[in-house]
């Protein structure tokens, strides 16, 4: 494995740690780390439910911090590591902020905007192209998400079962 690949894995592991914070807050476990010159300048994890903010995705949180650190809305020569393929909103923010590269773990067939559903980052109508590297720690990223949604389905099933048992009343 090359030094560059090891570097990508290092930062993706950091993003996975942040994704676990989202899980702990009962948010969809996605984490993001924005790196400039081998230094973290922004990080985030999904928080739209807790913050009552539909834009509080991990990527947006990391980009906002990066802008404050660099004191610039242009995040030139930065790399954003994120555990899940970005959505249209996040991909659009990446284009507007002029990041150099996004590295993501798991693809998102339903809402992925880096090639799965649509490719905002390479769209010919955009005035900036973002380099895409995908599949870094893919299995770990995908497993975290599938485990989270499995747990949520089991919780919902248990609640429905409890509601049915509660509503049944005594046998006559």
From Swiss-Prot:
Catalytic reaction annotation: adenosine(34) in tRNA + H2O + H(+) = inosine(34) in tRNA + NH4(+)
Binding site for Zn(2+): 57, 87, 90
Keyword Metal-binding (UniProt): yes
GO molecular function list: tRNA-specific adenosine-34 deaminase activity; zinc ion binding
Residue ranges annotated for the CMP/dCMP-type deaminase domain, each copy included: 6-117
Catalytic site positions: 59
Similarity comment: Belongs to the cytidine and deoxycytidylate deaminase family.
NCBIfam families documented for this protein: PRK10860.1
Name assigned to this protein: tRNA-specific adenosine deaminase
Organism: Salmonella typhimurium (strain LT2 / SGSC1412 / ATCC 700720)
Lineage: Bacteria, Pseudomonadati, Pseudomonadota, Gammaproteobacteria, Enterobacterales
């Amino acid at each position: 494995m090359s030094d560059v690949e090891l570097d990508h894995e290092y930062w993706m592991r950091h993003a996975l740690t942040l994704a676990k914070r989202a899980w702990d807050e009962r948010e969809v476990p996605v984490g993001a780390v924005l790196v400039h010159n081998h230094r973290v300048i922004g990080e985030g994890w999904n928080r739209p439910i807790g913050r009552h903010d539909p834009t509080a995705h991990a990527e947006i949180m990391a980009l906002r911090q990066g802008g404050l650190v660099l004191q610039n809305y242009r995040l030139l020569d930065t790399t954003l590591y994120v555990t899940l393929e970005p959505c249209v909103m996040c991909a659009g923010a990446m284009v507007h902020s002029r990041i150099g590269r996004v590295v993501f773990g798991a693809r998102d067939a339903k809402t992925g905007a880096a090639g799965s559903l649509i490719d905002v980052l390479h769209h010919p109508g955009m005035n900036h192209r973002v380099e895409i590297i995908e599949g870094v720690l893919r299995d770990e990223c995908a497993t975290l998400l599938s485990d989270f949604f499995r747990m949520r389905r089991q919780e919902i099933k248990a609640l429905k079962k409890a509601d049915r048992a509660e509503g049944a009343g005594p046998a006559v």
